[in-house]
From Swiss-Prot:
Function according to Swiss-Prot or TrEMBL: Forms part of the ribosomal stalk which helps the ribosome interact with GTP-bound translation factors.
Tagged with keyword Ribonucleoprotein: yes
GO cellular component: large ribosomal subunit
Region (Disordered): 1-26
MF terms in GO: large ribosomal subunit rRNA binding; structural constituent of ribosome
Biological processes per GO annotation: translation
PANTHER family: 60S RIBOSOMAL PROTEIN L12 (PTHR11661), LARGE RIBOSOMAL SUBUNIT PROTEIN UL11M (PTHR11661:SF1)
Source organism of this protein record: Halobacterium salinarum (strain ATCC 700922 / JCM 11081 / NRC-1)
Protein name as annotated: Large ribosomal subunit protein uL11
Length: 163
């Protein structure tokens, strides 16, 4: 009977210590093989927190499914900061270009509720607002109004590219 373990690991930097070791220790799987497979599959996310699901059988066989990092982690990575603002409506910690915002929306496409690029950009902008990140020098609310007005249609178009 298959069992499942869900963990959040730094892309390409998993090791046999916590959180993996304590979860995998009592299972029949080869911990080092699982760690190596996770690192191989997550190396593109280098250091960014990535959700990983490990499914294993009683015979020690396993499969790994890598999810998409949380939107906040992608925003922090793209903008180059570690911690969001304590007062996100007043103190801004970074600014993203519309192209950077679109890149994040494309990476998050499988997890977003949006049906087009404009709404996907607005979803990501919502996360930017809570972190204290501006978009094109404007706060997220102003940015979203401009998206609604069609100001960024030339960049956002209709569809997101496949991630």
């Amino acid at each position: 009977m298959a069992e499942t373990i869900e963990v959040l690991v730094a892309g390409g930097q998993a090791d046999p210590g916590p959180p993996l070791g304590p979860e995998l220790g009592p299972t029949p799987v080869d911990v080092q093989a699982v760690v190596q497979e996770i690192n191989d599959q997550t190396e593109a996310f280098d250091g960014t927190e990535v959700p990983v699901t490990i499914e294993y059988e009683d015979d020690g066989s396993f499969s790994i499914e890598v999810g998409v990092p949380p939107t906040a982690a992608l925003v922090k990575d793209e903008a180059g900061f570690d911690t969001g603002s304590g007062e996100p409506q007043e103190n801004f910690v970074a600014d993203l270009s519309i192209e950077q915002l679109k890149t994040i929306a494309e990476q998050k496409k499988p997890d977003l509720l949006a049906y087009d690029a404009r709404n996907a950009a607005k979803e990501v902008a919502g996360t930017c607002a809570s972190l204290g990140v501006t978009i094109e020098g404007e706060d997220a609310r102003t940015f979203n109004e401009r998206v609604d007005d069609g100001d960024y249609d030339d960049v956002l178009g209709d569809e997101l590219a496949a991630a």
